[in-house]
Amino acid sequence: MRLTYPTTLVLQALLQGHHHGFDIMDATGLPSGTVYPILRRLDAEGCVRSRWEKPGEARKEQRPPRRYYELTSHGRSVATEAVDRYRALQEVPAPVGRPGR
């Protein structure tokens, strides 16, 4: 599984309780053309389950039905590992001086 930075952001958003595409886009700052392919890939790889909300809920708010995503137990493990890995990378100090000196 490719754990790119955008994929890690989506996984982190799911860990934090963001469950539908627009909510994930708001949480991550990523565009729909990035978020939805990642969600499809995570679904295909067994990291998330998805379900459509009941049409009545959407109708009440006069909007299209939302598709909700939830991490599976496997997905939760992958997400935690990915987030921890990127956090560790942020703690690596930047090199001092110029290379070769």
Regions found by a protein language model. Give the residues of each.
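Amphipathic alpha-helical dimerization/coiled-coil segments
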Residues: 1, 73-101
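Short, charged/polar surface micro-motifs in flexible loops or helix N-caps
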Residues: 16-20, 44-45, 75-77
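Basic amphipathic alpha-helical segments that dock to polyanions
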Residues: 35-47
